[in-house]
Amino acid sequence: MVRGRHRSRDPQRRDLRGRDRRSASRTDARRQSAAERGCRRSQRGSAEGCACGRQTGPRAARSACCTACPSRSRRMSTTEGRPNFNGVPANKDFVAPSDSPVVHNLKKAGAIVIGLTNTPEFSFRGFTDNPLHGLTLNPWDPNITCGGSSGGAGSAVAAGIGTIAHGNDIGGSLRWPAHCNGVATIKPTQGRIPAFNGSATAERPMLAHLMSAQGPLARHVGDVRLALDVMSQADPRDPWWVPAPLAGPRPKGPIKVALARIPEDMDVDPSVRAALRQAADHLERSGYRVTEVDVPDIDGVWQTWCDIITNETVVMQEAGMLKVTSEDFHKAWGGMKTKANVLDLKAWMQATAARNGHIRAWQLFFEEYPVVLAPTTVKPTPGPRDDTVSADRVKEIFWGEIRFISAINVLGLPGAVVPVTLHDGKPIGVQLIAGRYREDLALDAAAAIEKRAGVLAHRLWETME
């Protein structure tokens, strides 16, 4: 609209300020608003929006696509000159020395970063709460979690605070908040979007790199796709970045989708089964061919993820984190460790070798089924602090409920989440998984579902007027 000179930035700035004020009190998702500063930047750049719109070609499209697009970065990401305390009181005086690659790429494309969103301490929980800024609420219902660790991002974008939000995902931190808040996202393939934290005092260990990914959250799948393109531009600070094309060859004939058969030990709520069936029907009506099948060793894949991430964290980070974190953090982290095997050096090497075998099995599976339709969780969204109830409750959540989310991280595969329906007024989403660097296939399937299911955030806004 702005690029095509159908609408100036001024009404967009006024809309942004108004919705920001109305929504923030309802969610507490934003921690430090740069909306006023962003709006001033938008005003200065109004003429640039029109000039940018006259450019042509793919690079020009990237330059113009985010012009005047209000975006939010999560607290774990660095924005030059802004605090970067990551939910930890001991870090409250940390100021980012430079923009992260994601923020740099967004700004380069014309996006206006309007603020930073809330995260749990060290972004290490699936529930967004911390001693500095407290609990972030879910705009649909304060009695359910907004997810984590990008819960502030998911809550904000659902409530209309910004168009695109940024998060990252090492165990579900993009996809879980997207599900909880009824928005769309993509956890890209490892290496798709460059990552670097200029505030970090040490390099991240290897498997943390291989299992984590940066990504966007938005209300519309089309905006997720747009933001993925922008965020994916090269940055020399990330040696793991991969210059892979954003679209690959189209599979011949109708695309076969594997509806993942859920393990018998996962107690599936009827509302989740109904949402999966509804998503499968949407895909069938869009020309896909959906078949319920077993996916390769989802239990073993999840256990490999749990063992690797837990042992790497215990060795590299645990002692330092426990010194400066809250009792709630200790409870949640203690619960996450209960399902992990303690690995010596040989067992660690065996776990990393097992990871290779799991990836190979899934890549072969994608030869027949290019897309997998899977649950995000098999249960209704839990309460806002359920991970502080007990260690058993944490294990129940990660192993018994969101197994299909965390398992995908160890494979390094792209996974999109799109909302499908509401149950008792709360959103339910599904996950679309594709082969390495085939985010296009996952997003195509997500867009097909969205076209028939609609954009759930619009229903939320009707209740917020």
UniProtKB/Swiss-Prot annotation:
One of the GO biological process terms: auxin biosynthetic process
Region annotated Disordered, chain positions: 1-40
Enzyme nomenclature, EC number: 3.5.1.-
InterPro entries in UniProt: Amidase (IPR000120), Amidase_CS (IPR020556), Amidase_dom (IPR023631), AS_sf (IPR036928)
Active site feature: S149 (charge relay system), S173 (acyl-ester intermediate)
Bias (Basic and acidic residues) ranges: 9-39
Domain of life (superkingdom): Bacteria
Pathway the protein takes part in: Plant hormone metabolism; auxin biosynthesis
GO molecular function, a single term: hydrolase activity
Sorted UniProt keywords: Auxin biosynthesis, Hydrolase
Matching SUPFAM superfamilies: Amidase signature (AS) enzymes (SSF75304)
Pfam family for this entry, one: Amidase
Top EC category: hydrolase
Family as reported in the entry's similarity comment: Belongs to the amidase family.
The protein's role, per its UniProt record: Hydrolyzes indole-3-acetamide (IAM) into indole-3-acetic acid (IAA).
PANTHER family: GLUTAMYL-TRNA(GLN) AMIDOTRANSFERASE SUBUNIT A, MITOCHONDRIAL (PTHR11895:SF7), TRANSAMIDASE (PTHR11895)
Protein name: Indoleacetamide hydrolase
Organism in which the protein naturally occurs: Bradyrhizobium japonicum
